[in-house]
Curated annotation (Swiss-Prot):
Major subcellular site: plastid
Designated name of the protein: Ribulose bisphosphate carboxylase large chain
Gene that encodes it: rbcL
Entry cofactors: Mg(2+)
Described function: RuBisCO catalyzes two reactions: the carboxylation of D-ribulose 1,5-bisphosphate, the primary event in carbon dioxide fixation, as well as the oxidative fragmentation of the pentose substrate in the photorespiration process. Both reactions occur simultaneously and in competition at the same active site.
Modified residues (N6,N6,N6-trimethyllysine): K7
Protein source organism: Abies mariesii
PTM comment, free text: The disulfide bond which can form in the large chain dimeric partners within the hexadecamer appears to be associated with oxidative stress and protein turnover.
Length: 443
């Protein structure tokens, strides 16, 4: 009787995929998963199951396994540690060989690592906490179209955070009135105004009309203030072709920056747009609409720092990153952790800030973090202290809510910002004297 060389049937994952003696390679992509196994499932088996199902494995041995080198291609769970203070939660560290992923494709990276495993029966919950992207892989990405330094040079704005404002009411204005609101804000002293993430091309305001009126507002404000101004024209659309059509039109109008919702639009569309922006000198502002669907649960989904790393590879010059002080959730150290991951070239492993791996970006351009959502002029000292110069501070209601109107609201924000930056440069302690600084400036 002929034998095929292996026994049929269900096989424990940990026999193949749990390898505590494995030494990680410099080219491996490393992942830290927070695993909550079902009762009765040992953590090694749960960790190995994640490694298997997100790389080469399936639930049984198949005869085609003999046609490839599993040792070369399999993901490996190489370490497991309990999560302090949590019952039956573990951090499983998984190493993936570089060759499992297509070069320059965030889409493929995510399809592999988080594509299938999250519905797995052996797990009660699963969260991807962090990824280490090796230089061998990150170098296959173009990254941000321009990055922080080039953006400052284009705008001729140095030594301070940039100021933005989302135009409200977000839906319902006509294009002409929308342009008017943009003009008032920019004239008052803001650097940027922004389309809301859900302003695309609706019946009350078609995209082309909005683009034209916003460009007019921009040029008028530029002429009056002598400063370079921008408005994030949202190019997000139902199809990639339509998105590119909008980006091309923005370029023809000569505006400096366009915008994209990268999670709802998808990484494929985002990377396409980022390449176009680099080739055509457009800055790219990224909004993270839908992120909380993915990242808000503590024990399931994916931490925002992973989405932030993915965006830096896919490409964007600004990305929304929480405020630490406004209306939306975000803890200070953890937020600062992924803010540094966006801006800096080299970030040390630091568990207190939620950073599981040392990340070296090998000179990939940085992304400006955008603080937006429920912040106003009294937050200015805290914001300048927390985010430093390389950031964009966006006040929607905090500008447009000024009782005298948009332009005075914009003036108030700009004055407050300049006062805080000056106070900081003079060595004053913003945490203690912040309110005093703002009061003095308000005179």
């Amino acid at each position: 009787k002929a034998s095929v060389g292996f026994k049929a049937g269900v096989k424990d994952y940990r026999l193949t995929y749990y390898t505590p003696e494995y030494q990680t390679k410099d080219t491996d992509i490393l992942a830290a998963f927070r695993v909550t196994p079902q009762p009765g499932v040992p953590p090694e088996e749960a960790g190995a199951a994640v490694a298997a199902e997100s790389s080469t494995g399936t639930w049984t041995t198949v005869w085609t396994d003999g046609l490839t080198s599993l040792d070369r291609y399999k993901g490996r769970c190489y370490d497991i540690e309990p999560v302090p203070g949590e019952e039956s939660q573990f951090i499983a560290y998984v190493a993936y060989p570089l060759d499992l992923f297509e070069e320059g494709s965030v889409t493929n990276l995510f399809t592999s690592i988080v594509g299938n495993v999250f519905g797995f029966k052996a797990l009660r919950a699963l969260r991807l906490e962090d990824l280490r992207i090796p230089p061998a892989y990150s170098k296959t990405f173009q990254g941000p179209p321009h990055g922080i330094q080039v953006e400052r040079d284009k705008l001729n704005k140095y030594g301070r955070p940039l100021l933005g404002c989302t135009i409200k009411p977000k839906l319902g204005l006509s294009a002409k009135n929308y342009g008017r609101a943009v003009y008032e804000c920019l004239r008052g002293g803001l650097d940027f105004t922004k389309d809301d993430e859900n302003v695309n091309s609706q019946p009350f305001m078609r995209w082309r009309d909005r683009f034209v009126f916003c460009a007019e507002a921009l040029y008028k404000a530029q002429a009056e203030t002598g400063e370079i101004k921008g408005h994030y024209l949202n190019a997000t659309a139902g199809t990639c072709e339509e998105m590119m059509k909008r980006a091309v039109f923005a370029r023809e109008l000569g505006v400096p920056i366009v915008m994209h919702d990268y999670l709802t639009g998808g990484f494929t569309a985002n990377t396409t747009l980022a390449h176009y922006c680099r080739d055509n000198g457009l800055l790219l502002h990224i909004h993270r609409a839908m992120h909380a669907v993915i990242d808000r649960q503590r024990n399931h989904g994916m931490h925002f720092r992973v989405l932030a790393k993915a965006l830096r590879m896919s490409g964007g010059d600004h990305i929304h990153a929480g405020t630490v002080v406004g209306k939306l959730e975000g803890e200070r150290d953890v937020t600062l952790g992924f803010v540094d991951l966006l801006r800096d070239d080299f970030i040390e492993k630091d568990r207190s800030r939620g950073i599981f791996f040392t990340q070296d970006w090998v000179s990939m351009p940085g992304v400006l973090p955008v603080a937006s959502g429920g912040i106003h002029v009294w937050h200015m000292p805290a914001l300048t202290e927390i985010f430093g110069d390389d950031s964009v501070l966006q006040f929607g209601g905090g500008t447009l809510g000024h009782p005298w109107g948009n332009a005075p609201g914009a003036v108030a924000n700009r004055v407050a910002l300049e006062a805080c930056v000056q106070a900081r440069n003079e060595g004053r302690d913003l945490a203690r004297e912040g309110n005093e600084v703002i009061r003095e400036a308000a005179k």
